[in-house]
Amino acid sequence: MAKRTKKVGIVGKYGTRYGASLRKMVKKIEISQHAKYTCSFCGKTKMKRRAVGIWHCGSCMKTVAGGAWTYNTTSAVTVKSAIKRLKEMKDQ
């Protein structure tokens, strides 16, 4: 079998349509949404995207809400770290 894509990867399905810069942006998004992420409950790399913002772990069968294209958004990480810091300050 011949190798199909060398540079374009997952966005090869769009062919020459829509322009190179738009396809590069879409490539970054599609790679992140199809990737498997580490589950925050069981620690295994089984977290997959089911729908927009819905993530499901195939190991522990937990379903959680997350980002549209990635499991954790930057704002969610910031909020979690702030909550953790406030809990530590309260305990002291």
Swiss-Prot record:
One of its GO terms (biological process) is translation. Pfam families: Ribosomal_L37ae (PF01780). Belongs to the eukaryotic ribosomal protein eL43 family. Keywords: Cytoplasm, Metal-binding, Ribonucleoprotein, Ribosomal protein, Zinc, Zinc-finger. Component of the large ribosomal subunit. The ribosome is a large ribonucleoprotein complex responsible for the synthesis of proteins in the cell. This is Large ribosomal subunit protein eL43. A zinc finger (C4-type) spans 39-60. The gene is rpl37a. InterPro entries: Ribosomal_eL37/eL43 (IPR011331), Ribosomal_eL43 (IPR002674), Ribosomal_zn-bd (IPR011332). Zn(2+) binds at residues 39, 42, 57, 60. One of its GO terms (cellular component) is cytosolic large ribosomal subunit. Component of the large ribosomal subunit. GO terms for molecular function: large ribosomal subunit rRNA binding; structural constituent of ribosome; zinc ion binding. It is found in: Cytoplasm. NCBIfam families: eL43_euk_arch, PRK03976.1.
